[in-house]
């Protein structure tokens, strides 16, 4: 991809303080990406301050497969199943407003005989294996073990029911207890060799996670340069809080999926954002929902306005992500957008089109994807609409992005 100068330049009269040392990024980046990122730090960092309307320029990172390899939500779900920490609901339909009757019945058949409502299901035991398999299937494939559709009726741009369902299955535990579960899963997954598989029920699942050294270094240097660094993730809030400590991001700078609480314990309902009230369970940190939550938590925008693009001075200058779920908050970044290539259609269409010169693409740092052998279908089906209908990917001016060849791998 052609290099481009950051367009939102710092004021010409700003000069570096003579006693100020700008942090320097380590090597390990593709092409000129390190230079582009260093330029961002040099231009917006505290040694050459750029302050649109905040004390610090904002940088926002997705978490799973952006800062770490693999998914900490998955790691937590598998740990919960292996250790019998999911409490049986009285009615599985209460765990998600999008759960289909077929899925609720399959879960009840496999799980309900094993425990009383409100008590943990023994999914880590031989007698609980079928229950573990059913939960894992619904979570991992959005279908039952027999292939019945597990979720229906959701907005594809504001929520992913399976992601939310993990958070909802934490019902009955306190946030502190969930953080302890996440810490145990973290210890296991970081200690496991790369490529490890673990048994969950009668099946196997990914059993390892790694922090990306390059992203840890980038976050450290952004913070040292005076950036306000945030994490926006579609994994549960307490889980991401635990993992984010490993890159020096504190809990008050983590925006994950958030449950409502009752008597200090998590419920099956979710906090809302923008025009979506708490308990409506339809606006999580997912695609357009990430914009809403970032606007709300980082920039203090309240009400329906949080769902809208904000003026440049009230947006992040930098964003990093790896998936179509990140595309909206990446587009909102005003200076630079880092994409880790996982062959996701809409995201790669926009990144390779690079219509404003602010996108940079990097292969995954561990086990990078091979080159996609066919072009990304930008002009036909690369975009997923609110109702799930595929459509062309369009630029801000509504022109259609042509199909793109995969060139960074």
Q: Where are the model-predicted features located?
A:
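Non-catalytic pre-domain segments flanking phosphatase-related domains
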Residues: 2-7, 11-63, 71, 76-107, ...
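Short, intrinsically disordered, charge-biased short linear motifs at domain edges
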Residues: 4-13, 116-117, 361-366
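Residue-level signal for mature regions of secreted extracellular proteins and peptides
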Residues: 13-14, 124, 371
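C-terminal cap/substrate-recognition subdomain and adjoining C-terminal extension
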Residues: 17-32, 42, 51, 56, ...
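Charged, low-complexity surface segments at secondary-structure and domain boundaries
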Residues: 18-27, 61-64, 150-151, 162-168, ...
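Short, flexible coil/linker elements and helix-boundary hinge sites characteristic
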Residues: 45-49, 84, 115, 140, ...
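A metal-dependent, Asp-based hydrolase signature
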Residues: 73, 80, 88-205
């Amino acid at each position: 991809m052609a290099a481009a100068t950051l367009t939102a330049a710092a004021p010409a009269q700003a000069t570096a303080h003579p006693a100020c040392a700008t942090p320097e990024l380590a090597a390990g980046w593709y092409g000129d990406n390190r230079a582009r990122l260093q330029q961002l730090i040099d231009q917006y960092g505290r040694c050459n301050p750029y302050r649109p309307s905040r004390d610090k320029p904002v940088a926002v990172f997705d978490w799973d497969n952006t800062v770490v390899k693999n998914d900490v939500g998955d790691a937590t779900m598998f740990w919960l199943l292996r250790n019998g920490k999911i409490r049986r609901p009285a009615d599985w339909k209460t765990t998600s407003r999008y759960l289909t009757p077929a899925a609720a019945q399959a879960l009840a058949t496999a799980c309900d005989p094993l425990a009383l409502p409100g008590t943990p299901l023994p999914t880590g035991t031989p007698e609980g294996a079928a229950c573990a398999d059913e939960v894992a299937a619904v979570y991992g494939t959005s279908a039952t073990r027999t292939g019945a559709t597990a979720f229906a009726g959701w907005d594809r741009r504001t929520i992913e029911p399976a992601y939310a369902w993990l958070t909802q299955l934490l019902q009955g535990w306190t946030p502190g207890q969930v953080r302890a579960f996440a810490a145990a899963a973290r210890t296991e997954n970081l200690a496991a060799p790369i490529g490890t598989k673990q048994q969950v029920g009668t099946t196997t699942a990914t059993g390892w996670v790694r922090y990306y050294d390059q992203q840890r270094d980038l976050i450290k240097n952004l913070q040292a340069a005076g950036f306000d660094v945030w994490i926006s993730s579609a994994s549960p809030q307490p889980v991401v809080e635990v993992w984010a400590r490993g890159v020096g991001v504190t809990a008050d700078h983590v925006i994950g999926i958030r449950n409502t609480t009752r008597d200090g314990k998590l419920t099956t309902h979710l906090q809302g954002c923008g025009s979506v009230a708490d308990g409506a369970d339809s606006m999580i940190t997912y695609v357009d929902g990430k914009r809403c939550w970032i606007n709300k938590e980082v920039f203090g925008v309240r009400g329906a306005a949080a769902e809208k693009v904000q003026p440049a001075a009230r947006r992040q200058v930098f964003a990093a992500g790896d998936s179509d779920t990140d595309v909206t908050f990446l587009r909102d970044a005003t200076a630079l957008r880092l994409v880790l290539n996982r062959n996701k259609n809409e995201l790669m269409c926009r990144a390779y089109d690079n219509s404003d010169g602010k996108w940079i693409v990097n292969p995954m740092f561990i086990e990078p994807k091979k080159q996609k052998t066919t072009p990304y279908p930008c002009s036909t089906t690369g975009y997923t609409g609110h109702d799930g209908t595929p459509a062309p990917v369009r630029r801000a001016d509504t022109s259609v992005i042509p199909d793109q060849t995969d060139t960074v791998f």
